Amino acid sequence: MTGDRGMIIHLVRSGGFGGMRREVRIETLSLPRGEREPLEGLVRAAGFFSLPEKFPKPGKGADFFTYSITVEDGERRHTVEVSQPSLPDGLRPLIREVSKRL
């Protein structure tokens, strides 16, 4: 549980057509409770702090997005880097939700 500390979520999305880079930093304590709790729940549901730091890149393909997402929760800090085709199902809802703020 995050208690009163909240989480800090930093997402960088790069690549895609044109190779654009966009990023967002969310401090969940600054969000209304109705947004904060579901977002923090997505971090927990993804098992984020147990995910590997990097996922294998696909052998073929171009114009995919690459995501680097870092979550800080108190003393814990973890970063995951993954390209769009390698995005695990458990992480998709978190990436989708945070990407809405890009």
Model regions: which residues?
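Function-determining sites in protein domains
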Residues: 1-102
